[in-house]
Amino acid sequence: MEPCELQNELVSAEGRNRKAVLCQRCGSRVLQPGTALFSRRQLFLPSMRKKPDLADGSNPDGDLLQEHWLVNDMFTFENVGFTKDVGNIKFLVCADCEIGPIGWHCLDDKNSFYVALERVSHE
């Protein structure tokens, strides 16, 4: 999606998500509209798979992603789970189908939870 399209369709004038954020696989709601800020930050996320396979951290395949929804409080999420610690990182997964990672949280920063735009859908 082009930056201009992204800005108009998904990001409000205040920089927040215009639409609900959903799991691409099962459609479960991850975030309500207006609850996350658009952020550009380069983060590596392992390839999508089920939570038990993700927590071992042994597979280095993945993507370097730059466009994210930033959430400052873990209780803002509607439906998200967390993996066991992988170093100082916890990956975010869909709480219903356990597919992920859809996002990333560094344990050093208690108030920053990133959800990759490429790993979710919007409604």
Swiss-Prot record:
The keyword Oxidoreductase appears for this protein = no
* Domain MSS4 stretches: 9-123
Q: Which UniProt keywords apply?
A: Acetylation, Guanine-nucleotide releasing factor, Metal-binding, Protein transport, Transport, Zinc
Q: Which domain of life is it from?
A: Eukaryota
Molecular function (GO) terms for this protein are: guanyl-nucleotide exchange factor activity; zinc ion binding
Q: Name one Pfam family in it.
A: Mss4
Q: Where is the signal peptide?
A: none
Q: List the disulfide bonds.
A: none
Q: Which PROSITE patterns does this UniProt record tie to the protein?
A: MSS4
The record's annotation in SUPFAM superfamilies points to: Mss4-like
Q: Does the keyword Transport apply?
A: yes
Q: Which residues carry this modification: N-acetylmethionine?
A: 1
A GO BP term, please?
small GTPase-mediated signal transduction
Q: Which amino acids does the record list as binding Zn(2+)? A: 23, 26, 94, 97
- Quaternary structure (record): Interacts with RAB8A.
Q: So what family is this one in?
A: Belongs to the DSS4/MSS4 family.
- Known function: Guanine-nucleotide-releasing protein that acts on members of the SEC4/YPT1/RAB subfamily. Stimulates GDP release from both YPT1, RAB3A and RAB10, but is less active on these proteins than on the SEC4 protein. Might play a general role in vesicular transport.
Q: What is this protein called?
A: Guanine nucleotide exchange factor MSS4
Species this protein is from: Mus musculus (Mouse)
Gene that this polypeptide is encoded by:
Rabif
